[in-house]
């Protein structure tokens, strides 16, 4: 049991037990100010005129007084005591909460990275594309996969209670609870998706922290049982209702279930199971049959219902055979394709035909969603036909080409790990022709006349030459679009390169 206690230890010595005083530090709100959209401050008359730490302190004081004549969630967004926009100050305080509560977790993360001696390769650790080399190495040996949607909404009171285990500061969480209930209007017992959407848009930093913390908490329990529990018999997960007393309950878990329940569900350790999470979904893949996958399915359902009080339907978890199911992950469609080949073998005077089945991970670019995104950004219509972008016509020719180059480079870098490159050719064609039509629209000319204009071809050639310097050698073949040549390079079609330094994708704008 000592081993389990060490495994679940939350580095108590590093915990910041006094976060409450930081709420009243002016530099915290200086950091919060820099994270909020500037458009909000334009409506409020500017930072120097209306934002001050004194107003924030007054607003916090009124939260404790419970005076609904001063602070309320009625139809008025104006605080009569402060005279300014209440939503503006609630967003400032939410940013302050997010910055303060992130401090102990950031210190713990930095310390753990230094101890593991992986700080030098931290970029690859953060990379979203590092998932795909993992899939290529592991998924071809697996048979079944389960698509899981992480359920939400979860009540904020449960998040606050779980967060209290990490940071021992009662006044801070009392103030956080008052803020969430008074300003976020989450007094209902079960928050709706509409309220969560409103909260995520008005306070994105705090919302992302609370959501990621919720996911991290359920994954810590899942990984603990996955890595440390073997031949564990359990039927219900109600024993995990209080996270603080997890150690004692875990110690007597097997004994309690063996005595109190006449029927128990065997739970065996699976060494060939793999777990991948991306945004609000996760993937569970295993080499074993569907019987064990169904056990994990019921485990997740009971975990969310009993520990987080989140209702999860069994239909949100689908179990499929990997060779017959495509996984939508990180903007790709991934599946395992079976390649069958026949080998003729001859021994003395006898000839044998041997059928060999090999597995290959196919990662395909979903061209239809990309065309929808390009159409939404006004680069083409819904059918994928390129159109001009007159909004950019006021910019210089160099700026227009640079914008198209940046978008094209981002898309090509991101989808360069695809097994088939035909979709990339079409994306390149749409952006290139949209660029030409935009330039022709700016100069009030036709596409043909613009291309025949002196210096235009050199300008476009410089545009694609700059791209060749950015992309690797096997991607330079895309520059042939400018010269209307075909794509027959076998190396470009077969090679696959994952850019592990991609941390996020830019908007199409």
From Swiss-Prot:
GO MF term (any one): RNA binding
An individual GO BP term: RNA splicing
Keywords per UniProt: Chloroplast, mRNA processing, Plastid, RNA-binding, tRNA processing
Domain of life according to the entry: Eukaryota
Compartment annotation: Plastid, Chloroplast
Gene Ontology CC annotation, any one: chloroplast
Family listed: Belongs to the intron maturase 2 family. MatK subfamily.
Role played: Usually encoded in the trnK tRNA gene intron. Probably assists in splicing its own and other chloroplast group II introns.
Protein's UniProt name: Maturase K
């Amino acid at each position: 049991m000592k081993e389990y206690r060490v495994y679940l230890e939350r580095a108590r010595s590093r915990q910041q037990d006094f976060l409450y005083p930081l709420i009243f530090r002016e530099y915290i709100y200086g950091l919060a100010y820099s994270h909020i959209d500037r458009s909000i401050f334009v409506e409020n008359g500017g930072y120097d005129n209306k934002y001050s730490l004194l107003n924030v302190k007054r607003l916090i004081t009124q939260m404790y007084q419970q005076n609904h004549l001063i602070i309320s969630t009625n139809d008025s967004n104006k605080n009569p005591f402060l005279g300014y926009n209440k939503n503006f100050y609630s967003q400032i305080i939410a940013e302050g909460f997010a910055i303060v509560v992130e401090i102990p977790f950031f210190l713990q993360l930095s310390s753990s990275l230094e101890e593991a001696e992986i700080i030098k390769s931290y970029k690859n650790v953060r990379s979203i594309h590092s998932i795909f080399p993992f899939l290529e190495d592991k998924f071809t040996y697996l048979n079944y996969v389960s698509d899981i949607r992480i359920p939400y909404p979860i009540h904020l009171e449960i998040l606050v209670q779980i967060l209290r285990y990490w940071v021992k500061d009662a006044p801070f969480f009392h103030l956080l609870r008052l803020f969430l209930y008074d300003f976020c209007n989450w007094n209902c017992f079960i928050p709706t998706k509409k309220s969560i959407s409103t909260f995520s848009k008005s306070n994105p930093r705090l919302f992302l922290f609370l959501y990621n913390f919720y996911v991290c908490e359920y994954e810590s329990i899942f990984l603990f049982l996955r890595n440390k529990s073997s031949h564990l018999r359990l039927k219900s997960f109600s024993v995990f209702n209080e996270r603080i007393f997890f150690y004692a309950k875990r110690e007597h878990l097997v004994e309690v279930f063996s005595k109190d329940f006449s029927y128990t569900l065997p739970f065996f350790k699976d060494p060939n199971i793999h777990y991948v999470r991306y945004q609000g979904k996760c993937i569970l893949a295993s080499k074993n049959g569907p019987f064990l996958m169904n056990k994990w399915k019921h485990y997740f359902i009971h975990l969310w219902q009993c520990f987080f009080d989140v209702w999860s339907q069994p239909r949100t978890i689908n179990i499929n055979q990997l060779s017959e199911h495509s996984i939508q992950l990180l903007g790709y469609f991934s599946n395992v394709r079976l390649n069958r080949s026949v080998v003729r073998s001859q021994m003395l005077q006898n000839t044998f035909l041997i059928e060999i089945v090999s597995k290959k991970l196919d990662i395909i670019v979903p061209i239809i969603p990309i065309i929808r995104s390009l159409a939404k950004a006004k680069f083409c219509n819904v059918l994928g036909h390129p159109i001009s972008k007159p909004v950019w016509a006021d910019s210089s020719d160099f700026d227009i080409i640079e914008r198209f180059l940046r978008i094209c480079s981002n898309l090509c870098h991101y989808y360069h790990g695809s097994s088939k490159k035909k979709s990339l050719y079409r994306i390149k064609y749409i952006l290139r022709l949209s660029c030409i039509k935009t330039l022709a629209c700016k100069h009030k000319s036709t596409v043909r006349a613009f291309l025949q204009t002196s210096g235009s071809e050199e300008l476009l050639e410089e545009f694609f030459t700059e791209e060749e310097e950015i992309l690797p050698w096997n991607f330079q073949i895309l520059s042939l679009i400018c010269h209307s040549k075909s794509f027959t390079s076998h190396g470009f079609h077969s090679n696959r390169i994952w850019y592990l330094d991609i941390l996020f994708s830019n908007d199409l704008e």
